[in-house]
């Protein structure tokens, strides 16, 4: 038997050896395998010949060689070498974050995550990127960041060969193949493949909009939507077309634009096999087969929601397009625009054509008139391949084909 003083000395010895241990094994047994003998028993790993003073440490070592992970999460079936790792993991599902920062009360599910966070308050950022000079509190964060410079994506999906820079992104991607959705909303029981998706969804119940614009005070539930909104104020358009160098604020807008160059029309109507460049155009077209939008006053149906809205104004006697100088109102915006043109007939015509001295209110009208003299027909109909001038009906015909 050991006295309390001897046991205290042993614990001190373990802590000291733990701090200077040159081995690269799991931290849970580093301090154990470095001690040759305490109570007279030595446990040796047959694979790597390391010696341990505790049988548990030997078992942990052997699992690193065999790949055995006996502890399984019953929520997502992920497996672990140690029971303590399983307990830490289960906090993700239970939303349990027992490690709280004393400075800002932010909570974490793992003590290592808390340690990394606390460095931000202490101003300690030990890990610096040698390419851009950015500092990080944890070496793992630096490693992931450096992949943004190198383009390295070491995590490969075995199903579709897609690569990722983060292991968490790969885990989330795999769920698109398995259909697994481990994160469930307690309010409506809707399930999600990613925790961030669940958090965003929960804000629909709470009404929380944590991302607020300091320019116009508009707020958002999603960080991605907030980033896109800020570009309205900054004018930033980071997504550039390689074919014509046109820039866009959103990646989705760039993808749609690029189809102008490639001719790709990925959205196909299963009724008539007609294809479209945008999903919104397909949805609008599909309504022509079903007559989706119905008036509640009459049994009249419409292909587009906008047509139904205009029709309903007849019942409500609503005329939203109001002339500022009198009480005249219009159901349709196009009627309002036509009236504006009539009222400005006597006003100055700014755009004059030098060949025939004809003048116009708008530059677009002047450009359209020029084609009468030049004979140019720059717009080609995709069906008949006829050349078209820029006139309202023909322009509409050309746009409907995309």
From Swiss-Prot:
A family per Pfam: zf-C2H2
InterPro entries, per the entry: Znf_C2H2-type (IPR050758), Znf_C2H2_sf (IPR036236), Znf_C2H2_type (IPR013087)
Signal peptide segment: none
UniProt subcellular location: Cytoplasm; Nucleus
Phosphoserine modification, residue list: 391
One term of GO molecular function: DNA binding
Zinc finger map (C2H2-type): 43-65, 71-93, 99-121, 127-149, 155-177, 183-205, 211-233, 239-261, 267-289, 293-315, 351-373
Keywords from the named record: Activator, Cytoplasm, DNA-binding, Metal-binding, Nucleus, Phosphoprotein, Repeat, Transcription, Transcription regulation, Zinc, Zinc-finger
Presence of keyword Nucleus: yes
Chief location category: cytoplasm
UniProt similarity note: Belongs to the krueppel C2H2-type zinc-finger protein family.
Additional note from the record: Significantly enhances POU5F1/OCT4-SOX2-KLF4-MYC (OSKM) mediated reprogramming of mouse embryonic fibroblasts into induced pluripotent stem cells, and can also substitute for SOX2 in this process.
Function: Transcriptional activator. Important for maintenance of pluripotency in embryonic stem cells. Binds directly to the POU5F1 distal enhancer and the NANOG proximal promoter, and enhances expression of both genes. Can also bind to numerous other gene promoters and regulates expression of many other pluripotency factors, either directly or indirectly. Promotes inhibition of MAPK signaling during embryonic stem cell differentiation.
Assembly description: Interacts with POU5F1.
The protein, known as: Zinc finger protein 322
Protein species of origin: Macaca fascicularis
Gene (name only): ZNF322
């Amino acid at each position: 038997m050991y006295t309390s003083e001897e046991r205290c000395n042993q614990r001190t010895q373990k802590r000291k050896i733990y701090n200077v241990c040159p081995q690269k094994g799991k931290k849970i047994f580093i301090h154990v395998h470095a001690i040759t003998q305490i109570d007279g028993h030595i446990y040796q790993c047959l694979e790597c010949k390391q010696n341990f003073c505790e049988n548990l440490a030997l078992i942990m070592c052997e699992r690193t060689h065999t790949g055995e992970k006996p502890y399984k999460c019953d929520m997502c079936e992920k497996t672990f070498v140690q029971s303590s790792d399983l307990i830490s993991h289960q906090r993700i599902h239970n939303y349990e974050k027992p490690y709280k920062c004393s400075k800002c009360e932010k909570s974490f599910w793992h003590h290592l995550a808390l340690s990394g966070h606390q460095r931000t308050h202490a101003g300690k950022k030990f890990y610096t990127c040698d390419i851009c000079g950015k500092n990080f509190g944890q070496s793992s964060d630096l490693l992931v960041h450096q992949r943004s410079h190198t383009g390295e994506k070491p995590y490969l999906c075995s199903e579709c060969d897609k690569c990722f820079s983060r292991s968490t992104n790969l885990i989330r991607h795999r769920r698109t193949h398995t259909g697994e959705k481990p994160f469930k909303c307690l309010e409506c029981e809707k399930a999600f493949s990613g925790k961030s998706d669940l958090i965003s969804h929960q804000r629909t119940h709470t009404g929380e909009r944590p991302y607020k614009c300091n320019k116009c005070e508009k707020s958002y539930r999603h960080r991605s939507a907030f980033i896109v909104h800020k570009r309205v104020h900054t004018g930033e358009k980071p997504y550039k077309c390689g074919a014509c160098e046109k820039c866009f604020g959103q990646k989705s807008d760039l993808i749609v634009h690029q189809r102008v160059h490639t001719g790709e029309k990925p959205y196909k109507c299963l009724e008539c096999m007609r294809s479209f460049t945008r999903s919104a155009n397909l949805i609008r077209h599909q309504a022509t087969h079903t007559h989706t939008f119905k008036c509640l006053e009459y049994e009249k149906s419409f292909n587009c929601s906008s047509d139904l809205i205009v029709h309903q104004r007849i019942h409500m006697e609503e005329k939203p397009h109001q002339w500022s100088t009198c009480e005249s109102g219009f159901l349709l915006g196009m009627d309002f625009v036509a009236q504006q043109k009539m009222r400005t007939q006597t006003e100055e015509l700014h755009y004059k054509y030098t060949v025939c001295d004809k003048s116009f209110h708008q530059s677009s009208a002047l450009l359209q008139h020029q084609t009468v003299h030049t004979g140019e027909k720059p717009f080609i109909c995709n069906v008949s391949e006829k050349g078209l001038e820029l006139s309202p009906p023909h322009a509409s015909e050309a746009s409907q084909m995309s």
